Each structure stands twice: as structure tokens, then as C-alpha cells.
Amino acid sequence: MFKVIKCNELNEKLINKKVEINAWVKKIRHHGKFTFLDIRDRYEKAQVLITEEHLLKIVEKIKLEYCIKIQGLLIKRPSNMINANMTTGYFEILAKNIEIISKCNELPFMIEDDNNASENSKLKYRYLDLRRDSLKNKIILRCQATHLIRNFLVKRKFLELETPTFVKSTPEGARDFVIPSRIHKGSFYALPQSPQLYKQLIMIAGFDKYFQIARCYRDEDSRGDRQPEFTQLDLEMSFVKKENIFKLIENMLFSIFKNCLNIKLSKKFKKITYKTAMNKYGSDKPDTRFELTLQDISRNLKNSEFNVFKDILNNKGSIKTLIVKDKADTFSRAKINNLEEIAKLYKTQGLYFTKIENNKFSGGIAKFLKTEEQQLIKAYSLENNDIIFFIANNKWEIACKAMGQIRIKIANDLGLIDENKFEFLWVYDFPLFEYDENTKTYIPAHHMFSIPKKRYISNLEKNPNKAIGEIYDLVLNGVELGSGSIRIHNKELQQRIFNIIGFQKEKSEDRFGFFLKALEYGAPNHGGIAIGIDRLIMLMTKSTSIKDVILFPKNSFAASPLDNSPSKISNEQLKELGINIAPDDT
């Protein structure tokens, strides 16, 4: 009788015992009168030794990735053949029976981590690519993490509730994926961009702690960290402040990193305001694994003779600087030109610089800073071989963002980023609105359901540009991992927000009437957060794209080479739905 086991279950206790393993053939090695098979299942790899003549004839028919059944005797490897890097490296199976369960066609690419197959080929044969250890392990880690999330929240009395996936189209910034209704011709459902309104309705219903591992859909251009369909941990709580949510998420992530990666995070993440993040790092999602911080030098240059700086300051603009210590000699003209190209992307007045040599400014705009030279050297403790970069712009935000991107580029070039570090950060107190120069209207900076901080409520309509919301983001290594807020629970205030963004009563009733009505029935104060599961696992596994941690992702054109979706449907289906396809003018 053979004991059916998995590859990882080979151990000392089974030595000289009969075992049976079902697995795939990873490698075939012929050595004269005997052959080795390296086999693999989900759990581990193992080595099979074939010596019997009738079995060697079967092996002649076996190719890579055949699915086979091996029955044999577990024996110890000779000392010179031990592989201490494998948990099964001390044993091998002496084959007694071999059965081919299923053959494998010629492979489109080798099942190896370093194969050079194209992305489309890997996605077309995703079921083969998933046999690679590195990809398989990422998917398994994702399963472990979501399991931990569920257990963590259920233990804290959260209810896992499912919200609809056919919803009313209420665009939240990106385009909706729409679904035509056969029964209600001319009407459409939308796939949810998030469960935002439904989770707020859940709070109004009295379920004070909700979570969901939610599938969400946004019709937007694909990027390395975006897909048309994605997964997020969505949660909401009644009667809370943002600090309650911070503590919950910090403890949850502490558990995930400890159990999945054996990494002990701090149980209390750093916290900074949006304004500090922009001023110090030039980003609302700063990478804090390295210092290299921005400084505002406007005050020191208020009497500057340099016309560019003078004009900017006369227009109440900003001058941001970045000081790189003891590295001036590494910045060639070509390298500085590359940094200037980044500044141009933000339509700044340019990137300026000067170096410190012999205790004075040298090169770049040194000749325009003679008056301020010694004052700046003293104020910023500048030393020989330092280099100082300047960006000036009439808009504070543009100056910050441009210099923030240059900060990242310099950090990468100088190798300042510790890739083994996980730096979490809460960014809070975001602006409630942004002004859209194209439409000349205010739009929500995050979304339209976030409550303003109390001191801004009375003057909302008068100064929407100054309003700060109870809004917060969770950032990990410069990537926005999650976003949340304390929500509006008052119908009148919600309508005021709608009015500011141009959703007057008729329009807001049409789009959100059902939600406004619900706010009339004893809505509790509540807040929550959504955390991108795909992004979290991408960062935990040090992947370069969320495609690496999604089981069956789309390609960069939001298409699936695996099943050739999206695809056309028949004229009969279109007719049934009452849809006519406009001719393609291209």
C-alpha cells in the first residue's frame, strides 16, 4: 500500500516506506543506466530516481510538464548528492511505478523565473506561467494575507457583507463600465468603482462594523499599478474618529507582515498633514525610506536680483530647493539636463542649480546669487561639494510636485532607497476641493462624501479653496495604498457639497436621490477606508506590477489574451438589448 503524499511531506519517518506523489515534470536528467526526474507540485519539488528497465522505457515517452503519478520507495540521497537548499534535498524516491496522467504539448516558453517570453504570451498561457515558483508564491501569499484580514476583522466583530455589483451609474472620477439591461431597454447598470454609497447605507442600517474583499471596476487607462478590475479591502465603522481607523489598520498590517513575511512593523505609523508632505517631500504620497527633503527658500530670496526669482516672488509664488550633500562632483551636465527635463513636464520656469566650491557658489546661477551667497551658505549649513537645486513657480503646488519628482530621481540615481524597508505613513488633512482650470469649477479632491473639518463648514461656499476635509491616505514606500475619510451624515451638508461641485438639487436628486433620502433616517457619524489588496501584495512581494499578483490579469490595453476578451457579440444579442453599434470612423 502506497501512502499518498505531497512533495513537501517527504521526511525521515518515511524512509524505506512506499509513497505515491502526483506532480508535474520539471526536469529530466539521463545518466547512462539510470534517469532522474525533478518533479513539482504546489508545495515543493522532489527528485525521483529511475533504475528499472521497464520504467526507463516509460520515461523515454515523458516530456517536460507532463502530469504523472509516481509510486516508489523513499530513500536517502548519497551524501554527495544532498541539496541542502531544498527541504526535500536529503531524499529521493526510488520509482517502482510510473503513470502518465496527462501529456503536455510543446511549451510556448520555459517554466522558469528567468524566461524571456513576452507579456502577452505569458498572459495567454497564464495557467503555465503560474507554475513558476516566484509567481505561484506571490498568489499563495495573497491568499494568506486575505485570510488573515478576514480572521482579524471577524474577531473584532466586523460583519463581512456583500454589496451589489450591478449598480446605478454615478461616476466618481473615472469612467464606469456599463451593462445594458435587456428588460429595461435603453437603461444601463454600472459595475461599481467602489462600494462607497452602499457601505454608507450599511452604516445607516445599523451594522456598525462592515468589511468586504470587494471587486471594483474602473474604465481607465492601464498603468503598472492599475487594472480595469481590481480588489480592495473595503471597511466602514460607525461612531468613530480617524484615530480609531488608524489604530485598527496599523494592528491589522502588523499581523499580516508578521505572519506572511516574518517582518515586525512598528505598531504606530508616522503621521503628517498633506501640507507638510507637499512642503517636505513634494508629494502627497511621499517615499520616506530616505531623507533628502525639500525646503522653501522664498523668504531668503525676497530681495533677489535674479529676475526669474524676483517675478515669482512678486506674484506670491514659491521657490523650492533640494540640497544634496557632498555629491556635487557626481552631477555632470548631462545628468543635470535629465533633471531639467523632469522640471519641464510640470511647466515650471526651469530647474536651476549651483554648487559649493571653496566655500562659495560656483556654476549654474551662482553669478545671480552674489548678494545672498554667504547668507544662504550659513542658513542651510552648506559645505564644499554640496549642490543646491531650485525650482520656482507661481503655484506652490507645482513647485512642490516638480521638485518632489526630482527628489525621487536623485534618490534612485544615488542609490539612497533601501529596497528592503517598509515605511508606512498616514497623510491626513487633505483639501476638500480642487479647482479645475478647464471647467472653471471645483471638483472633489478625493470624493464628494467626505466631511469638512468643523472650522470650515460655516464658510464652505465662500472659501471652498481653503476647506480641509477629514480625509486620510495610507502610503507605503511612496505608493498610495489606501484612502479613506470620515463621511458626511447630514443631508443638508451633503447637498451643500453637491452644490459647490455643480450638482444642483435636480442633478443630485437624479444621481444620488436614494442616498440623500437615506440620510433623513437617523444616519450615524461614520468613517472608513479602502486598501488596495493588489498594491499591498505587489509591495510585499517586491513586484514591479500588480499584474504579478493577480491570478488572471489584463494586459496593458485592458484586454485578456487568455480568453480574447473583450469580444464582439452577435447581432441577435445586440438586437435583444436594443443596441446599435456606431460605425468605426477610424
From Swiss-Prot:
- Which residues are involved in binding L-aspartate? 172, 218, 446, 487
What PROSITE patterns is this protein classified in? AA_TRNA_LIGASE_II (PS50862)
Q: Which CDD domains match?
A: AspRS_core (cd00777), EcAspRS_like_N (cd04317)
Q: Does the keyword Protein biosynthesis apply?
A: yes
State the reactions this protein catalyses. Answer: tRNA(Asx) + L-aspartate + ATP = L-aspartyl-tRNA(Asx) + AMP + diphosphate
Q: Where are the transmembrane segments?
A: none
Report residue spans for region: Aspartate: 196-199
Q: Does the keyword Ion transport apply?
A: no
- Name a biological process GO annotation: aspartyl-tRNA aminoacylation
Record localization? Cytoplasm
What Pfam families does the record point to? GAD (PF02938), tRNA-synt_2 (PF00152), tRNA_anti-codon (PF01336)
Residues annotated as binding ATP are: 218-220, 227, 480, 532-535
List keywords of the entry alphabetically.
Aminoacyl-tRNA synthetase, ATP-binding, Cytoplasm, Ligase, Nucleotide-binding, Protein biosynthesis
Q: What are its E.C. numbers?
A: 6.1.1.23
What would you give as a GO molecular function for this chain, any one? aspartate-tRNA ligase activity
What EC class is this? ligase
Family from the record? Belongs to the class-II aminoacyl-tRNA synthetase family. Type 1 subfamily.
Q: What is the name listed in the Swiss-Prot or TrEMBL entry for this protein?
A: Aspartate--tRNA(Asp/Asn) ligase
Source species of the chain: Borreliella afzelii (strain PKo)
